[in-house]
Protein backbone atom coordinates (compact mmCIF):
# COMPACT_ATOMS: atom_id res chain seq x y z
CA UNK A 1 0.00 0.00 0.00
CA UNK A 2 2.78 2.40 0.95
CA UNK A 3 4.54 1.70 -2.34
CA UNK A 4 1.35 2.34 -4.30
CA UNK A 5 0.71 5.66 -2.52
CA UNK A 6 4.32 6.75 -3.03
CA UNK A 7 4.13 5.91 -6.73
CA UNK A 8 0.87 7.85 -7.08
CA UNK A 9 2.32 10.90 -5.35
CA UNK A 10 5.40 10.83 -7.56
CA UNK A 11 3.16 10.56 -10.62
CA UNK A 12 1.12 13.59 -9.52
CA UNK A 13 4.27 15.56 -8.78
CA UNK A 14 5.69 14.67 -12.19
CA UNK A 15 2.52 15.86 -13.92
CA UNK A 16 2.57 19.11 -11.96
CA UNK A 17 6.21 19.71 -12.80
CA UNK A 18 5.62 19.06 -16.49
CA UNK A 19 2.69 21.50 -16.43
CA UNK A 20 4.79 24.17 -14.72
CA UNK A 21 7.57 23.74 -17.27
CA UNK A 22 5.04 24.11 -20.10
CA UNK A 23 3.69 27.33 -18.57
CA UNK A 24 7.24 28.65 -18.22
CA UNK A 25 8.03 27.89 -21.86
CA UNK A 26 4.78 29.53 -23.02
CA UNK A 27 5.50 32.69 -21.02
CA UNK A 28 9.03 32.88 -22.43
CA UNK A 29 7.72 32.41 -25.98
CA UNK A 30 5.16 35.19 -25.59
CA UNK A 31 7.84 37.49 -24.21
CA UNK A 32 10.11 36.75 -27.17
CA UNK A 33 7.25 37.40 -29.61
CA UNK A 34 6.60 40.84 -28.14
CA UNK A 35 10.31 41.64 -28.15
CA UNK A 36 10.59 40.60 -31.79
CA UNK A 37 7.63 42.77 -32.83
CA UNK A 38 9.08 45.77 -31.02
CA UNK A 39 12.51 45.18 -32.54
CA UNK A 40 10.97 45.07 -36.03
CA UNK A 41 9.44 48.50 -35.43
CA UNK A 42 12.80 49.87 -34.29
CA UNK A 43 11.83 50.20 -30.63
CA UNK A 44 14.68 49.39 -28.27
CA UNK A 45 13.61 47.49 -25.19
CA UNK A 46 15.34 48.61 -21.98
CA UNK A 47 18.12 46.19 -21.08
CA UNK A 48 16.56 45.44 -17.71
CA UNK A 49 13.47 44.13 -19.54
CA UNK A 50 15.24 42.39 -22.41
CA UNK A 51 16.62 39.66 -20.17
CA UNK A 52 15.12 38.04 -17.13
CA UNK A 53 17.10 38.24 -13.90
CA UNK A 54 17.65 34.50 -13.86
CA UNK A 55 20.13 32.50 -11.85
CA UNK A 56 22.99 31.20 -14.08
CA UNK A 57 21.98 27.65 -13.23
CA UNK A 58 18.58 28.21 -14.84
CA UNK A 59 20.11 27.96 -18.32
CA UNK A 60 20.03 24.19 -18.31
CA UNK A 61 18.31 21.39 -20.20
CA UNK A 62 18.14 17.65 -20.72
CA UNK A 63 15.46 14.97 -20.68
CA UNK A 64 12.85 15.14 -17.96
CA UNK A 65 13.12 12.76 -15.03
CA UNK A 66 10.82 12.68 -12.03
CA UNK A 67 12.38 14.45 -9.03
CA UNK A 68 13.41 12.53 -5.95
CA UNK A 69 13.31 15.69 -3.81
CA UNK A 70 11.26 18.88 -3.77
CA UNK A 71 14.25 20.97 -4.91
CA UNK A 72 13.55 20.58 -8.62
CA UNK A 73 9.87 21.37 -8.10
CA UNK A 74 10.72 24.53 -6.13
CA UNK A 75 13.26 25.59 -8.75
CA UNK A 76 10.64 25.15 -11.48
CA UNK A 77 8.20 27.33 -9.53
CA UNK A 78 10.88 30.02 -9.21
CA UNK A 79 11.63 29.89 -12.94
CA UNK A 80 7.91 30.18 -13.73
CA UNK A 81 7.63 33.22 -11.46
CA UNK A 82 10.58 34.87 -13.22
CA UNK A 83 9.22 34.07 -16.69
CA UNK A 84 5.77 35.45 -15.85
CA UNK A 85 7.29 38.54 -14.24
CA UNK A 86 9.36 39.29 -17.35
CA UNK A 87 6.34 38.71 -19.60
CA UNK A 88 4.23 41.18 -17.59
CA UNK A 89 7.00 43.80 -17.65
CA UNK A 90 7.55 43.53 -21.41
CA UNK A 91 3.79 43.51 -22.06
CA UNK A 92 3.35 46.58 -19.87
CA UNK A 93 6.18 48.33 -21.74
CA UNK A 94 4.61 47.50 -25.11
CA UNK A 95 1.18 48.74 -24.05
CA UNK A 96 2.62 52.20 -23.41
CA UNK A 97 3.70 52.53 -27.04
CA UNK A 98 1.42 54.23 -29.61
CA UNK A 99 0.04 51.19 -31.42
CA UNK A 100 -3.63 52.19 -31.36
CA UNK A 101 -5.83 54.04 -33.84
CA UNK A 102 -6.29 57.81 -33.33
CA UNK A 103 -9.55 57.78 -35.33
CA UNK A 104 -11.25 54.39 -34.84
CA UNK A 105 -13.58 53.40 -37.66
CA UNK A 106 -12.54 56.26 -39.94
CA UNK A 107 -11.41 55.75 -43.53
CA UNK A 108 -7.73 56.21 -44.39
CA UNK A 109 -7.46 58.66 -47.29
CA UNK A 110 -3.69 58.91 -47.66
CA UNK A 111 -0.88 56.57 -46.58
CA UNK A 112 2.69 57.19 -45.44
CA UNK A 113 5.19 57.64 -48.28
CA UNK A 114 5.56 59.42 -51.60
CA UNK A 115 2.40 60.81 -53.17
CA UNK A 116 1.31 63.60 -55.51
CA UNK A 117 1.20 66.78 -53.43
CA UNK A 118 -2.39 68.14 -53.43
CA UNK A 119 -1.17 71.75 -53.69
CA UNK A 120 1.84 71.54 -56.03
CA UNK A 121 0.71 68.58 -58.12
CA UNK A 122 4.10 66.88 -58.01
CA UNK A 123 5.61 63.97 -56.11
CA UNK A 124 6.32 64.69 -52.44
CA UNK A 125 6.87 62.77 -49.23
CA UNK A 126 3.83 62.37 -46.96
CA UNK A 127 5.18 61.82 -43.44
CA UNK A 128 2.02 60.39 -41.91
CA UNK A 129 -1.41 58.88 -42.44
CA UNK A 130 -4.59 60.85 -43.16
CA UNK A 131 -7.96 59.79 -41.74
CA UNK A 132 -11.23 61.12 -43.14
CA UNK A 133 -12.96 62.96 -40.28
CA UNK A 134 -15.60 65.65 -40.09
CA UNK A 135 -14.74 68.85 -38.28
CA UNK A 136 -15.33 68.30 -34.58
CA UNK A 137 -14.77 64.52 -34.49
CA UNK A 138 -12.82 63.12 -31.53
CA UNK A 139 -9.07 62.61 -31.87
CA UNK A 140 -7.63 60.07 -29.44
CA UNK A 141 -4.13 59.54 -28.07
CA UNK A 142 -2.70 56.31 -29.43
CA UNK A 143 -0.60 55.60 -26.33
CA UNK A 144 0.34 56.87 -22.89
CA UNK A 145 2.64 59.89 -22.82
CA UNK A 146 3.27 63.55 -22.13
CA UNK A 147 2.09 66.40 -24.36
CA UNK A 148 5.14 68.30 -25.66
CA UNK A 149 3.41 70.51 -28.23
CA UNK A 150 -0.12 71.91 -28.28
CA UNK A 151 -0.77 74.82 -30.61
CA UNK A 152 -0.38 76.26 -34.10
CA UNK A 153 2.50 74.63 -36.02
CA UNK A 154 2.77 75.93 -39.59
CA UNK A 155 1.47 73.48 -42.19
CA UNK A 156 0.12 71.22 -39.45
CA UNK A 157 -2.32 73.92 -38.39
CA UNK A 158 -3.35 73.27 -34.81
CA UNK A 159 -1.25 70.30 -33.74
CA UNK A 160 -0.66 68.11 -30.69
CA UNK A 161 2.53 66.12 -30.21
CA UNK A 162 2.88 63.45 -27.53
CA UNK A 163 6.15 62.01 -26.22
CA UNK A 164 5.74 58.30 -25.44
CA UNK A 165 9.31 57.77 -24.26
CA UNK A 166 12.13 55.76 -25.84
CA UNK A 167 12.41 58.32 -28.64
CA UNK A 168 8.83 57.73 -29.86
CA UNK A 169 6.46 60.65 -30.45
CA UNK A 170 3.13 61.03 -32.25
CA UNK A 171 1.69 64.07 -34.00
CA UNK A 172 -1.96 64.93 -34.64
CA UNK A 173 -2.49 67.72 -37.18
CA UNK A 174 -5.10 70.00 -38.82
CA UNK A 175 -7.12 70.10 -35.58
CA UNK A 176 -10.06 72.45 -35.05
CA UNK A 177 -9.72 72.48 -31.27
CA UNK A 178 -7.02 71.32 -28.86
CA UNK A 179 -8.22 69.87 -25.55
CA UNK A 180 -4.85 69.40 -23.81
CA UNK A 181 -1.97 71.62 -22.76
CA UNK A 182 1.77 71.23 -23.03
CA UNK A 183 2.99 69.18 -20.06
CA UNK A 184 -0.25 67.23 -19.63
CA UNK A 185 0.00 63.50 -19.05
CA UNK A 186 -2.38 61.51 -21.26
CA UNK A 187 -3.41 57.87 -21.47
CA UNK A 188 -4.12 55.70 -24.49
CA UNK A 189 -7.63 56.43 -25.74
CA UNK A 190 -7.93 59.89 -24.16
CA UNK A 191 -9.66 62.49 -26.34
CA UNK A 192 -6.95 65.11 -26.89
CA UNK A 193 -8.48 67.24 -29.64
CA UNK A 194 -11.19 67.67 -32.26
CA UNK A 195 -10.45 67.17 -35.95
CA UNK A 196 -10.59 69.98 -38.47
CA UNK A 197 -8.90 71.49 -41.51
CA UNK A 198 -6.44 74.04 -40.16
CA UNK A 199 -3.04 74.54 -41.75
CA UNK A 200 -2.06 73.06 -45.10
CA UNK A 201 -5.21 71.04 -45.68
CA UNK A 202 -7.70 70.54 -48.51
CA UNK A 203 -10.58 69.55 -46.21
CA UNK A 204 -11.51 68.15 -42.80
CA UNK A 205 -9.33 65.19 -41.80
CA UNK A 206 -6.79 64.03 -39.24
CA UNK A 207 -3.11 63.90 -40.15
CA UNK A 208 -1.32 61.41 -37.88
CA UNK A 209 2.42 60.78 -37.61
CA UNK A 210 4.66 58.46 -35.63
CA UNK A 211 8.25 59.61 -35.21
CA UNK A 212 11.29 57.82 -33.84
CA UNK A 213 14.10 60.08 -32.68
CA UNK A 214 12.54 62.88 -34.72
CA UNK A 215 12.32 60.86 -37.93
CA UNK A 216 8.89 60.03 -39.38
CA UNK A 217 8.37 56.26 -39.63
Describe each PLM feature range.
Residues 1-107, 111:
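Non-catalytic extracellular/periplasmic "stalk"
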Residues 87, 93-217:
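Catalytic cores of peptidoglycan-degrading enzymes
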Amino acid sequence: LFSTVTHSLKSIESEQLAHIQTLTANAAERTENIQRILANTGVKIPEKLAQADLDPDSAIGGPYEAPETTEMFENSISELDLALDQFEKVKSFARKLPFNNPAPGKQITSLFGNRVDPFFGRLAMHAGIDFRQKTGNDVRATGDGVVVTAGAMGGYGYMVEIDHGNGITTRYGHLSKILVDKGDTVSEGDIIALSGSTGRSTGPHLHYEVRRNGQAV
